[in-house]
């Protein structure tokens, strides 16, 4: 069947409204436990969450379903999504589960799964679980009473992740003398990220580290990088770091308070790895949303940019298929496959800090090498998600814009995989032209797809 539950980043929605309900989480736990149970041995599942109030409810429901299916559950509490991926591998678990809605506000939540290797589940496995969950007559294969699973709290999980994340930073380098502003979005990394940076010697100025269950992503974190930028200028810090609620994405601010997106950071890291001969095939993997300037930059430096559909899962899939070690998204998902199987904001931050330390230059000088093309992105709420080619006014508008831009720009329309939104993106050489065309296309989409 189709992807009726899972979007590009798992299951997501408003709490206590279908599908993000406790009974759905219970059935998902049963389905996951049934799908991944194999043989008579004990099976293990790692469950982590961010700081949303509803996380406790979903943690309990998922645990009940998984235990009923015969899985032992290891609850690690609030930790970043990449930490759950790591712990799933580290603890030799059969499955990892993350309860988070990433950058969304507290009233939303989500559930996503990792396989035993720490990778997000492929579509066909999610569809198998969907079939089980949505079939009211599904016959669950419950284990015998003595084989029901148990639940455990893993108190040292944050420490394990810190040791792992620090292992990606050269042993002969420290962050002594660096002043770092970090905004943890009142989310999953509110404890771990500042502590890891402090252990490496940085002076850390903390924002968004007082979660109360309701303030995750509220005017803070990667969606509000201007907050970090202001604090960097105020404190004369060397760098600013803005994470999202589950800490798998990163937006960076240089010492001047200039906000850098994922494309600029990917260019910096790609050039560093190519110079060291550590980027296989000189290949960088990014999505269709990445700026044209990144593609030009890679060509000028003897590399190639491979584009994928939007979603870090698709970036990772392409990286595995082509043997690439660096990939990411403009939105700040950065994947260093030598160390991790998914986007990791703290890991990415340490790689940037390493480059700053090794080169002895300020971030503004290092990252200023990529001059982005003017790009306008507009999110339009839509009621229908029909193929754009089937809506003639929209198709005509796209064709007209492509004709006007020629080979010096591009237009992209895509539906969000997690929201009722159409993303309208226009890119070109002239900012006034780009803004005008993007507004025109957004109005057409709003008029005909409402």
From Swiss-Prot:
Molecular function (Gene Ontology), one example: phosphomannomutase activity
Enzyme Commission (EC) number: 5.4.2.10
EC category: isomerase
Superkingdom, natural source: Bacteria
Cofactor: how and how many bound: Binds 1 Mg(2+) ion per subunit.
GO cellular component terms listed in the entry, alphabetical order: cytosol
GO term, biological process aspect, one: UDP-N-acetylglucosamine biosynthetic process
Cofactor(s) the protein needs: Mg(2+)
Residue positions binding Mg(2+): 102, 244, 246, 248
Gene3D superfamilies to which the protein is assigned, alphabetical: Alpha-D-Glucose-1,6-Bisphosphate, subunit A, domain 3, Alpha-D-phosphohexomutase, C-terminal domain
Residue pairs linked by disulfide bridges in the UniProt entry: none
Pfam families found in the cross-reference section: PGM_PMM_I (PF02878), PGM_PMM_II (PF02879), PGM_PMM_III (PF02880), PGM_PMM_IV (PF00408)
Catalytic activity: alpha-D-glucosamine 1-phosphate = D-glucosamine 6-phosphate
Keywords: Isomerase, Magnesium, Metal-binding, Phosphoprotein
Entries under SUPFAM superfamilies matching the protein: Phosphoglucomutase, C-terminal domain (SSF55957), Phosphoglucomutase, first 3 domains (SSF53738)
Post-translational modification: Activated by phosphorylation.
Entry annotation: catalytic residues: 102
Positions bearing Phosphoserine: 102
Function in brief: Catalyzes the conversion of glucosamine-6-phosphate to glucosamine-1-phosphate.
UniProt similarity note: Belongs to the phosphohexose mutase family.
Name by which UniProt lists this protein: Phosphoglucosamine mutase
